[in-house]
Amino acid sequence: MNRLAKQLKFLLAAGILISFSTVGLAQFPGAKLTPGDTLKSIRISADKKVTLSIYAPKASEVTVSGDFLQSYGGQKLKKDELGIWSVTVGPVAPDLYSYDFSVDGMKVIDPKNIQVKEGAGGYSNLMEVPGKEADYLAVKNVPHGNLEKVWFYAGTLGKTSRVHIYTPPGYEKIKDKLPVLYLQHGGGDNDASWATAGRANFILDNLLAEGKMKPMIVVMPFGNPGSGFFSGAGVEADPYYSYFFKDLVPYVESHYNVGTSRENRAYAGLSMGGLQALNMGIFYPEKFAYVLPLSTGFFPEILQSMEEKYTSNLKNSEINKLKLFWIAMGGEKDIAYKNGENTKALFDKFGIKYQTNSYPAGHTFITWRHNLVEFAPILFR
């Protein structure tokens, strides 16, 4: 290509870029820039105080809720003369938090923040407060595994199902069969939640890079394949368990390089997923070596039904053959704390052996991420 042709090519490219830039600035003919166009919705000061803002000039009330607040419920924002609503809270400890705005009673996500958590009930925003305490979930210069969204046909459901699957760094070169951790979300979330709000893949990357855990495949399924959140006693009426054992496990074991014995399987779940973990330990103990319910426990009426209808299951000696039955809670402010204590009392009554753990951050992903940091290194040893 001669010099003139190169110059013409450069000028043409520059003209296209300028044209697109002009369109981007103008947006639409006659449109005017608003304070919201240049708004930075999250500002974190040196002392870790967080200011959240949203442009809503016609709103009469705006609140924000999230797990960075010290209590449940929303915090009111104040409106300035430009129509920007803001609130400053903190200092906020370094970690990853979710939040939602409510504008005149309507939940809205932050339009200036592309970091979101996908859930069964919609989207929430994510906000990272940097600092040493948040190092465990940081995206570091270490080997990274792959996080895949996988769609497959589930015969028991008669439809296609989605699952998130993590494979460790260098998976393609690993010849040995790998163990599998099935990692279940809670009632308001879906199969993406452990990867977004949970940051599971980055946490596992960091633990592997530090030599703290064994390589494993992590399967994050959707936990509500039926009509919704099922919390009844037993497993017969919930389509999840048929889906899990007849569709999901066979798919994973036929498409990935994994071991198929109980010693190669672990199951962990939070909240609703924790109830499913409890059921796995009680009704399917021969299928797993590790069962880890997080921030959960049976409701009082379910405990009574369990004791009346499923005595033989609670007395099953296979339960105590689990290498680990690990029940973790988010401290006394965890909304499932009382149910968890009552469930442990039932286990004590039937001689079911278990270990306990607590991270005092309540019923939040802050607790569950730290749970993952603690239990992942224990598995498959």
Indicate residue ranges for each PLM-predicted region:
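Bacterial N-terminal signal peptides that target proteins for export
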Residues: N2-L12
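Bacterial N-terminal signal peptides
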Residues: L11-V23
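Bacterial Sec-dependent signal peptides at the C-terminal "C-region" and cleavage site
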Residues: F20-K32
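Non-catalytic cap/lid and distal C-terminal segments of serine-dependent acyl enzymes
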Residues: Q27-F28, T38-G73, K78-R381
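Short, motif-level signal for alpha-helix interfacial/capping segments enriched in acidic residues
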Residues: P35
